[in-house]
Regions:
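A glycine- and Lys/Arg-enriched "phosphate-lid" helix/loop adjacent to the NTP-binding pocket
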Residues: 1-13, 21-73, 120-127, 135
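Arginine/glycine-rich "motif VI" loop of SF2 helicases in the C-terminal RecA-like domain
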Residues: 20-24, 81-84
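NTP-dependent small-molecule kinase module
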Residues: 71-76, 80-139
């Protein structure tokens, strides 16, 4: 829809949902894989030239390229409207797939390291119950 009120409300809903997730201790990371128009064209051509890649191609992709600038404006607006400390966007240069993948993987790793996750503690009472259950399963 072209209605800006529709999109404004949609973006507010997304931001509210992400805030709810973060409030409930869900870590939200968002990645925008920023592909240049030239690289997109190269990838489309490769898909068209290789029969084993035809399944990845949709004719609508070529038509939609005509609206590249409009999409960029919309993406930038969406990123601005939904970026928050509790739900950050990471804009990743994606023309070179291995580099993009490395940046995403490092970001996830750093986030997990900062979270310092650990297995939950098991109470002594529960540990005893589990031992009894294990004993009942032995032959």
């Amino acid at each position: 829809p072209q209605d800006t009120a529709f999109w404004d409300e949609r973006l507010r809903s997304i931001a509210a949902h992400e805030r709810h997730l973060a409030f409930n201790r869900t870590v939200v990371l968002k990645f925008w894989l920023n592909l240049s128009q030239d690289e997109q064209k190269r990838r489309f051509l490769r898909r068209l030239q290789r029969p084993d890649k035809h399944w990845k191609f949709d004719e609508a992709d070529v038509r939609e390229r005509e609206h590249w600038d409009d999409y960029m404006v919309a993406y930038q607006a969406a990123i601005r409207a939904t970026h928050a400390d509790w739900a950050p966007w990471y804009v990743i240069p994606a023309d070179h797939k291995p580099t993009a993948r490395l940046i995403v993987a490092r970001t996830i790793r750093q986030t997990l390291e900062a979270m310092d996750p650990d297995y939950p503690e098991v109470s002594a009472e529960r540990a005893q119950r589990l031992q009894r259950l294990a004993g009942s399963l032995k032959l």
